[in-house]
Amino acid sequence: DVMKLENEAYAENMKNLNFISEKVLDIRTQVDNLLDFSIAGSQRPIELDASMDVEYIFGDYLSDVCAQLMKSNYEVDAEGISFKQVKVAVNMAFLTRIFSNLTDNIYKYADNKKPVVMKTAFTKKTFSVEIGNGVCDNKTLLKSAGIGLKSVDAMMQRMNGSMSFKREHGKFWVKLEFPIV
């Protein structure tokens, strides 16, 4: 950023600096993904935080994701979010990394002209969060090593939950499922 300020007058330099900034951000993201993957794949047992109401745990996370996406000009459909008086036990540090990873993936791969859909669901035994986004034609998933989603899956398993994803009707969906305690 400092270099950009000092080189404002030179369009070619700005083009190169923007490219370099993009690559630095890509590297930072991959380092974060590797850290997540390492943490998630550890054999050391994790402690789950005390069980709490799902609204208390997930309300702020989902609200923050909505706000971040809308600030970046994404349309968000959060009509499907609802909460019931049930409790889950999670590791908040893992949950923070999971939502950060999913938000980063939306920025990297989603079409910001199509809405990001967020919804919650309940069964007798589980609470789930689903996030779906339109897939942008000029952003390819082939560039991805899939480390981020593998990390999310591993962190979910370590919290006794599960993660699944699917691609259908031009949307990419991620589902996080947590056991109700």
Where do the protein language model's features map onto the residues?
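Short conserved segments within the C-terminal catalytic ATPase subdomain
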Residues: 68-79
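Short alpha-helical segment of the dimerization/phosphotransfer core of two-component systems
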Residues: 22-27
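Short beta-strand/loop element within the Bergerat-fold HATPase_c
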Residues: 113-125
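Short flexible loop/turn segments at helix-to-beta-strand junctions
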Residues: 42-52, 89
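Glycine-rich/acidic phosphate-handling loop/turn and adjacent ATP-lid/helix
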Residues: 129-147
